[in-house]
């Protein structure tokens, strides 16, 4: 029962984040297309792609540091892994679609950023085995390009929890 109430709160928080990010004026948003490779345990690789909208940055001060945060919303796809003799009994051979919303923090070091999102996973696999997932991203963004290291997991609230770790490169416009 306790699990169900936590799950309901996480769903409400995710929905609120997606609504806020979706309400961004189009002229205030930066759009990004990202692609790369995702790895799970055992060196099993898959393709990954994301489409992101990042809102206008909001500056704030934390001690002596001048930082900014920006809302973000993303749609993502993690491709299937090929069927092999080693993974024939694992649930890894179909794609997973994600919708996520959260925030990006920047200004702490040059053009680096840290993002944290809550995600809804439409499909399940042994890597993303619950409808809700946590997404953490560490990256660098230029005027037109970005590179990011991202991890997606449900924090072991549901097993199996292999998670996905990926390196993404993208363009901004």
PLM-predicted stretches and their roles:
Residues 1-30:
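Cleavable N-terminal export/targeting peptides
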Residues 26-85, 164-172:
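Short glycine/proline- and aromatic-enriched beta-strand/turn motifs that initiate or cap beta-hairpins
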Residues 29, 130-173:
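Predominantly the C-terminal beta-signal and adjacent terminal strand-loop region
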Residues 29-33, 65-73, 99, 110-116, ...:
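Transmembrane beta-strands of outer-membrane beta-barrel proteins
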Residues 35-41, 56, 73-81, 107-111, ...:
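Transmembrane beta-strands of outer-membrane beta-barrel pores
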Residues 44-54, 93-99, 130-134, 141-143, ...:
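Residues that define the transmembrane beta-barrel architecture of outer-membrane proteins
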Residues 77-94, 124-126:
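Flexible, solvent-exposed loop segments that connect beta-strands
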Residues 115-139:
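Short, positively charged, low-complexity/disordered linker segments
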């Amino acid at each position: 029962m306790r699990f169900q109430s936590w799950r309901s709160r996480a769903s409400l928080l995710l929905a609120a984040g997606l609504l806020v990010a979706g309400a961004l004026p189009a002229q205030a948003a930066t759009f990004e297309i990202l692609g790369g490779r995702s790895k799970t345990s055992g060196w099993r690789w898959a393709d990954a792609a994301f489409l992101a909208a990042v809102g206008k940055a909001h500056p704030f001060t934390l001690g002596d540091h001048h930082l900014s945060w920006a809302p973000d919303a993303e749609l993502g796809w993690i491709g299937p892994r090929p069927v092999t003799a080693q993974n024939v009994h694992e649930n890894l051979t179909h794609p997973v679609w994600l919708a996520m919303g959260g925030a990006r923090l920047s200004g702490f070091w040059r053009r680096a950023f840290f993002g944290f999102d809550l995600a809804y996973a439409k499909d399940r696999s042994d890597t993303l085995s619950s409808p809700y997932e946590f997404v953490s991203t560490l990256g660098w963004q230029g005027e037109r390009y970005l590179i990011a290291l991202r991890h997606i997991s449900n924090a072991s609230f549901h097993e199996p929890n292999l998670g996905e770790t990926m390196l993404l490169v993208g363009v901004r416009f």
